[in-house]
UniProtKB/Swiss-Prot annotation:
Keyword match Iron: no
NCBIfam families in the cross-refs: Gln_ase, PRK00971.1-4
Gene that encodes the chain: glsA
Protein name listed in UniProt: Glutaminase
E.C. number(s) listed in UniProt: 3.5.1.2
GO BP annotations listed: glutamate biosynthetic process; glutamine catabolic process
An MF annotation (GO) of this entry: glutaminase activity
Subunit structure: Homotetramer.
Length: 413
């Protein structure tokens, strides 16, 4: 039985950052100030529904600001772009997340800062909704995105509300400008309960993969969001998801992302996968220190930068067929992380028989370095399972015919 190497790679990344102890817990929320600073987790989910994770992936934590893009998507789905944009603009603020950043029409600058998120929250379930009905609508929808029933940490919400003076002042100003209709306390209560929904990194990976897939749930196949809603949400995440660190993030990491002060961090590569990390210590910008390191390494190693000029492959595994004692795996397109992940998943699921396996690269256009490493590791595991492995590469798209351990693989001519 072949095994998948991706979880091993994720464990290696966690080991690389585990000794990083810089950063501080969020100290303005008592429940978060006393949280365990040590948990560390990472999870990936492809648009095909393949989930990989490592570390403390079963630990629940509150979404906090990570809830903002999902709430924005829900508001867009319910109300439409025109109604949402009448309340909240789409420009980066360049200021801290808890500033009252308004444009010339007194709209919050974007949905990723607190002012914008409070306004977005008030659009969901209609302006005449009660707090509990609105929060339940959000919780239920987030549960659909995660693929399981999520719950609210009401103890933490009460702790957060006790020190919510700044958000209350923002809500009062928004009400004064006619952006929201509810009383300021009710608006902040609703928003705070939204932030207190509990998730794991695996939940967030599935939720983000739904956005990456244009609104189709990667596990259930259910259509939850319109593709245009997902595109708008990812655009805002790219420009404003990391607050006043957004420009630096997009340049160096290149993944639409959103952070939360509980230590969560999510990222989305459109059409490919969703990523989530959890580590509670934060940098001065309010982003997880180890989470940022993990994302930078994933982006570099896996070629995930949104502005990469590498071609993106569709269905990478064209076919797996058998002729006598020989199994042929035919690949196609440009080999990047997602394409090579499809290859690895296919060989793990396939019941190989016979004595030989031939990897046919006749239709392959190019290889990203990460794909070379992943393909070579997959071939090594086929060899170690007792099969003789050959590579058919008439256009020399592979730089060499070595397995991942440095031994030579045979060429098929």
């Amino acid at each position: 039985m072949l095994t998948m190497p991706i979880p091993e790679y994720l464990h290696e990344i966690l080991d690389d950052v585990r000794d990083t102890t810089s950063g501080e817990l969020a100290d303005y929320i008592p429940e978060l100030k006393s949280a365990d600073p040590n948990p560390l987790a990472v999870a990936l989910c492809t648009v095909n529904g393949h989930i990989y994770s490592a570390g403390d992936d079963d630990i629940e934590f509150t979404m906090q600001s990570i809830s903002k893009p999902f709430a924005y998507a829900l508001a867009l789905q319910e109300c439409g772009f025109d109604e949402v944009s009448a309340s909240v603009a789409l420009e980066p603020s360049g200021e801290a997340f808890n500033e009252l950043s308004l444009d010339g029409e007194n709209r919050p600058m974007n949905p990723m800062i607190n002012a914008g998120a409070i306004a977005i929250n008030q659009l969901i379930n209609g302006s005449d909704s009660t707090v509990e009905d609105r929060v339940e609508k959000i919780r239920h929808y987030f549960s659909e995105l995660a693929g399981r029933e999520l719950t609210i940490d009401r103890v933490l919400a009460e702790s957060e509300l006790a020190g919510a003076d700044r958000n209350l002042s923002i809500a009062h100003m928004l009400r004064n400008y006619g952006v929201i209709e509810d009383e300021a306390h009710d608006a902040v209560l609703s928003y705070t309960l939204q932030c207190a929904i509990k998730v794991t990194t695996r939940d967030l990976a599935v939720m983000t993969a739904t956005l990456a897939a244009g609104g189709t749930h990667p596990i259930t196949g259910k259509k939850l969001l319109d593709a245009r809603v997902c595109r708008l949400t990812l655009s805002v995440m790219a420009s404003a998801g990391m607050y006043d660190e957004a420009g630096q993030w997009l340049s160096t990491v290149g993944i639409p992302a959103k952070s939360g002060v509980a230590g969560g961090l999510i990222g989305i590569l459109p059409g490919q996968l969703g990523i989530a990390t959890f580590s509670p210590r934060l940098n001065p910008k309010g982003n997880s220190v180890r989470g940022v390191k993990i994302f930078k390494q994933l982006s570099d190693d896996m070629g995930l930068h949104l502005m990469s000029t590498e071609q993106v492959s569709g269905h990478a595994v064209r076919s797996i067929t058998r002729d006598g004692d020989t199994t042929f795996i035919q690949m196609q397109g440009a080999m990047n992380f997602s394409a090579s992940e499809s290859f690895l998943h296919a060989i793990v699921e396939h019941n190989f028989e016979g004595t030989e396996v031939v990897l046919d690269l006749t239709r392959v256009l190019s290889f990203h370095p990460v794909a070379i490493r992943m393909i070579k590791e997959g071939l090594k595991r086929i060899r170690d399972a007792g099969f003789e492995v050959f590579i058919l590469d008439p256009d020399d798209v592979l730089p060499d015919f070595m397995f991942s351990d440095g031994t030579i693989c045979k060429e098929r001519v």
